[in-house]
Amino acid sequence: MLNFLKIPIDIASNTSYTITRKINNEIGGIYDVDRKTVTNVILGKEVDCVPAGFWFHFPAEQHSGDAAVQAHLDLAKAIDLDMLKIMTESLMPYGDIRCAADWKKLKPFTRQSPFIVEQIDLMKRVCDKLGDDKALLATVHGVWASMFHIFNGPDCYEERRDALAATLREDRDAFRHGLDVVTDGLSLLIDEMKTTGIHGFYYAALGGEANMLSREEFDEVIKPCEIRLLREAKDENHFVMLHMCKDHLDLTRYADYPCDAVNWGIYSDNISLEEGRKLFAGKTILGGLDDRDGVLVHGTKEQIERRVAELMDEMKGYPFILGADCTLPTDIPYDNIRAAIEATRKHAR
């Protein structure tokens, strides 16, 4: 039995976990890995083994509609995942914001806005098929990410993020109007997501890069909106995982965010797992493996197994979910992901 820190939260105590998957490892142990296992780890409760969570963006032709639903179902069938993050590629619309003053023109979103309708349809259909088996996470693109999508579209973030920051500095009042509209729209989205059957939220936060926004800009403008959304997402039936994306992050900006679990890139010039345990004390950590290089992407089964064993020893006694810095390459061999998941069973204590 793995003993973790106790966190005083009660999530879905009356939830029925109807499907349990028993996984035999090479040393004869049998471990139950179900939705409750994932929830218990996130709450810091005792579990038999460490769960794992990995995800990647599907090809463009599988971003929406029937193809997107089938891509999630095929992945769940191909890899016996402990948790499935539903990849929502329907973003806030791009095209109307060209300069700082344009933010004042941004009109409120509604529950019928296409990006909300499309995301909710995908989640409902995936949850209808998988809801009794896997821990299902809804992806929420955070306020800074959504502002960027409206301003520039989904691509070239590193090249264009400073241009977005410049609109904040040029006309803060206009930017705040746009930010309020975006935050209200995400609030509607989160509320609708709770009707789909998901069990938790994966909030993808951008904007914490130390070399982009100042601490004052972040704390005064971005942080209050994110804390509002995280508080709205987190309730007795839904946990919240905070993903802090990109490199050169000032992670202290997120230390008091209301969430149950955290994930960041330890291979991206950010703090280590050990340092993160101190900064995010009491929160479950997901991560440990490089998402773009290293053993998970390029290694052999034996190399992956050794690295997972090292991570489990490093995180012994702390609530931990094996994962990667961020999304994996779309073309990563499924056998590599399977090897990492199987290694958590083999080295369970």
Provide a role label for each language-model segment.
Residues 1-4, 105, 115:
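Acidic/proline-rich low-complexity IDRs
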Residues 3-13, 17-24:
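Short, positively charged and aromatic/hydrophobic N-terminal segments
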Residues 24-59, 66, 71, 82-86, ...:
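Active-site loop segments of alpha/beta catalytic cores
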Residues 64-69, 94-101:
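Glycine-rich loop at the start of a catalytic domain that most often binds anionic cofactors/ligands
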Residues 77-95:
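Short N-terminal amphipathic alpha-helices
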Residues 102-109, 161-162:
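A charged helix-plus-loop insertion that forms the helical arch/lid used to bind
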